[in-house]
Amino acid sequence: MNICFLMGKIISEINFKFMIQGKNKSIAIFQIEVENKTIITVKGYDEIADYCYNQLQKDNYIIIMGILDYKGEIEITEIEQFTLK
């Protein structure tokens, strides 16, 4: 398990889906762009998915703590929105 911390800008629409089978009820998937212009796909489940869908939108800046999975995507464990001044 690889824990990572990322800060970036949301560059895609947040795709929210309900899951029929499995341990999770819902998922939110979107992409962020970090400072060096790398684009990373991130995903959150259940409560985090609800927060992402209801509170975030394209062009928001976020800080994420997550787990790097085998596909190179980040599964969000904690997330916080911030603004640049």
Model-found features: residue ranges?
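Single-stranded nucleic acid-binding surfaces, predominantly the OB-fold ssDNA-binding core
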Residues: M1-K85
